[in-house]
């Protein structure tokens, strides 16, 4: 059995004055589903005004959550905290080996913080990461373009569609919205 964890699909959708992040609940080790109800979407910050979702190795992702939350507490602003974390990621050896991606969003901004220390803002308000990320991104873009569904519903449906295609993604969706 392979010791590689395949652990998620996360999608972030921004529509109108709402932003939603959704994630599936499946954690896979090799060819075995180890857990079907993992929670990969969380609220961060003093008042829970930042949503975050992770894809990648779970221990690495929790480390990044903690580091990002510390930057958020220190700098108080999402973009600044993301850039400061990315700087650390590029300069600290222990962070360079972390195998995870973060999607973070507040009322104004959505960002991906990549495993190489990049900070990327999506041009259309939709971003997806993880093993089913391409499927979820495609589904969310189609739903955004051709329906009047709200951000929460689009994010939920996009994960469901990805779960129908990607073997590392299930339909046990956790979604949160600002």
UniProtKB/Swiss-Prot annotation:
Presence of the UniProt keyword 4Fe-4S in the record: no
User: According to the UniProt entry, what is the EC number of this protein?
Assistant: 3.4.25.2
| Family matches, as SUPFAM superfamilies | N-terminal nucleophile aminohydrolases (Ntn hydrolases) (SSF56235)
Q: Which residues form the active site?
A: 8
- A GO molecular function held by the record: metal ion binding
Instruction: Spell out the GO cellular component terms annotated for this protein, sorted alphabetically and separated by semicolons.
Output: HslUV protease complex; proteasome core complex
Q: Does the keyword Disulfide bond apply?
A: no
Localization, UniProt: Cytoplasm
Going by the UniProt record, its keywords in alphabetical order are: Allosteric enzyme, Cytoplasm, Hydrolase, Metal-binding, Protease, Sodium, Threonine protease
Q: Which reaction does it catalyse?
A: ATP-dependent cleavage of peptide bonds with broad specificity
What processes does the entry annotate via GO biological process terms? proteolysis involved in protein catabolic process
Positions bound to Na(+): 163, 166, 169
Per the entry, what this protein does is: Protease subunit of a proteasome-like degradation complex believed to be a general protein degrading machinery.
Q: Which PANTHER family match?
A: ATP-DEPENDENT PROTEASE SUBUNIT HSLV, METALLOPROTEASE TLDD
Assembly and partners are described as: A double ring-shaped homohexamer of HslV is capped on each side by a ring-shaped HslU homohexamer. The assembly of the HslU/HslV complex is dependent on binding of ATP.
Its recorded name reads: ATP-dependent protease subunit HslV
Q: Record the organism.
A: Xylella fastidiosa (strain Temecula1 / ATCC 700964)
């Amino acid at each position: 059995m392979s010791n590689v964890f395949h652990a998620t699909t996360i999608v972030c959708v921004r529509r109108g004055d709402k932003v939603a992040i959704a994630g599936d609940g499946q954690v896979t080790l090799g060819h075995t589903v180890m857990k079907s109800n993992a929670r990969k979407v969380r609220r961060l910050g003093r008042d829970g005004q930042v949503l975050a979702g992770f894809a990648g190795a779970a221990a690495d992702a929790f480390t990044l959550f903690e580091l990002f939350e510390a930057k958020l507490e220190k700098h108080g602003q999402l973009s600044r905290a993301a850039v400061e974390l990315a700087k650390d990621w590029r300069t600290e050896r222990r962070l360079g080996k972390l195998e995870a991606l973060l999607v973070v969003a507040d009322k104004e901004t959505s960002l991906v913080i990549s495993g190489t220390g990049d900070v990327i803002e999506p041009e259309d308000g939709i971003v997806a990461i993880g093993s089913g990320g391409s499927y979820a991104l495609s589904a969310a873009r189609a739903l955004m373009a051709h329906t009047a569904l709200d951000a929460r519903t689009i994010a939920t449906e996009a994960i469901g569609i990805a779960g129908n295609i990607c073997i590392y993604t299930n339909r046990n969706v956790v979604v949160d919205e600002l």
